[in-house]
Amino acid sequence: KIAIVGLTSDGLMKNEYAEMEEDVCIEKTLVSAKRWIRYIHEVEEPDFLIVIYHGGLNKISSTNKRNEKNVNEAEKIMEELGVIDVIITAHQHQTVVGKDHGTIYVQAGQNAEELVHLSIKFKKRTTSYEIEHIDSKVIDLNDYHEDEQLLKETLTFNE
């Protein structure tokens, strides 16, 4: 069983108007992550947990501006939760692949110039699956020809 959790960093939500929606509740990223990931582990008992996080990694932040303080919390999430298998980050527009606190982290650049391919091999147990191995590979899309038909079909999205 695979569980996927989506998170957005505190710093990015300050400029949004989601609080105007009556069914939307905004709270601190780390608080929400701890509650929901604990709930998922206790109730759903996943074999594998992926977090998709619109925020970045402090270790690759080129600036340490005060206003970015709550934007790049991936390390904090990995360290304090410790049960995440893969965290996919976004925000800093740099390609990064690594491992911290037992969690694989990836971030795939910007403008679809690169992709990060994860290959995950599981080993079947009696009632569950166990991660046997995770490989990651950065794919440079500049090595591939553009699909002219697809470019025509998506032209309105690119304008």
Q: Where are the predicted features?
A:
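Acidic, metal/ion-coordinating pockets
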Residues: 1-149
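Active-site nucleophile-His-acid catalytic modules used for acyl/amide transfer and hydrolysis
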Residues: 148-159
